[in-house]
Amino acid sequence: LLVRFEKLLESDAPLAEVLPSIYKQHEERYAGYTLRQLCQEMHDLYARHNVKQLQKEMFRKEHFPRVSMNPQEANYAYLRGEVELVRLPDAEGRIAAEGALPYPPGVLCVVPGEIWGGAVLRYFSALEEGINLLPGFAPELQGVYIEEHDGRKQVWCYVIKPRDAQSTLLKGEKL
């Protein structure tokens, strides 16, 4: 299968022949495209965002997100509704209410109670750009949500509300 793919790449085969279902779903975007063009755009996207380095940093201790809250406490806050859904750029510096996982690699990159930022935020931002630039090739994402606004898909996530914004009606509530 890999040898066949390499031959298709070398011959610069039309995308409509190589990936017909994706081509049909996004014909306007990929009209006249070849496999080599698509691969080059993917490569350029990952190089522009230095995704290889971001993937390394996300799983090295010195780059882990800062822990601000016990994961169980963050989960309880989520269950009590002490959260707000924000666009990914607005999550920077905020406490994650849910774990976020892109597949691949299929490993949590931020867990409840950690601060959104650094390599994790930049990685998810790169994925958001890829979802928009290359329709049909979106990774599976868990713990974040894709919503379309003004013709663009945006990544949103739940973060813990600041203490002063949380409802006073919840005082004394126990789970």
Give residue spans per PLM region.
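Non-catalytic terminal extensions of PLP-dependent enzymes
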Residues: 1-175
